[in-house]
Amino acid sequence: MTEYNPRDLADLVIKPIITEKATLLLEQNKYVFDVLPKATKPEIKAAIESLFDVKVTGVNTIKPPRKKRRVGRFIGHKPLYKRAIITLEEGDTINLFPDV
């Protein structure tokens, strides 16, 4: 097992994703996060376990194709991003909506 620096791991996870599909996955104890495109599955697993103090059983990643964007006569692309679907062990939860 490789040791990771906790400071570097915190930078891998950008934000949680709250969409209709992501909330349906919450019922299956799966959470969706945007992560850096260079992040690997073992790094994502270590980052989630250290940030939220939970046990991760699986990591699935999605790297969708970039969409074209036009500004005047110039054609560019939206930034590349990567999504991670995290499966947690039974009984573990991540509190995405803290009590106000």
UniProtKB/Swiss-Prot annotation:
GO biological process: translation
GO cellular component: ribonucleoprotein complex; ribosome
Cystine connections: none
UniProt keyword annotations, A-Z: Ribonucleoprotein, Ribosomal protein, RNA-binding, rRNA-binding
A Pfam family of this chain: Ribosomal_L23
Assembly description: Part of the 50S ribosomal subunit. Contacts protein L29, and trigger factor when it is bound to the ribosome.
Protein name: Large ribosomal subunit protein uL23
Organism: Crocosphaera subtropica (strain ATCC 51142 / BH68) (Cyanothece sp. (strain ATCC 51142))
